[in-house]
Amino acid sequence: MKNYSKNATHLITVLLFSFVVILLIIPSKCEAVSNDMQPLEARSADLVPEPRYIIDVPPRCPPGSKFIKNRCRVIVP
């Protein structure tokens, strides 16, 4: 009879432990799913800060050319 009660106690302990683990895991999974359901713009806005100051720097052209009308043009002498 002792053996059965020991097995039952062990079984109840394992079941309670697994129940507690499930209760801890399920809310975090639900939160991850709700974050995935948000639009991409809403998620990326939280992650990437917008640059405050945008400085317009003209691109550098190779020697012998100039930046004309948004392109590097070769100057022919």
UniProtKB/Swiss-Prot annotation:
Principal location class: secreted
A cellular-component GO term for this protein: extracellular region
Tissue: Expressed by the venom gland.
Residue ranges annotated as propeptide in the record: 33-52
Pfam families noted in UniProt: Secapin (PF17521)
Compartments where located: Secreted
A GO MF label: serine-type endopeptidase inhibitor activity
Disulfide bond entries: C61-C72
Keywords: Antibiotic, Antimicrobial, Disulfide bond, Fungicide, Hemostasis impairing toxin, Immunity, Innate immunity, Protease inhibitor, Secreted, Serine protease inhibitor, Signal, Toxin
GO BP, sorted A to Z: defense response to bacterium; defense response to fungus; innate immune response; killing of cells of another organism; venom-mediated perturbation of biological process
Annotated signal peptide: 1-32
Function text: Serine protease inhibitor which exhibits antifibrinolytic, antielastolytic and antimicrobial activities. Displays antimicrobial activity against bacteria and fungi. Likely functions in the innate immune response to microbial infection and possibly in the venom, as an antifibrinolytic agent. Not toxic to mice but does induce slight sedation at higher doses (from 40 mg/kg). At a dose of 80 mg/kg, sedation occurs 15 minutes after injection and is accompanied by piloerection and hypothermia.
Family statement: Belongs to the secapin family.
The name this protein goes by in its record: Secapin
Organism the protein comes from: Apis mellifera
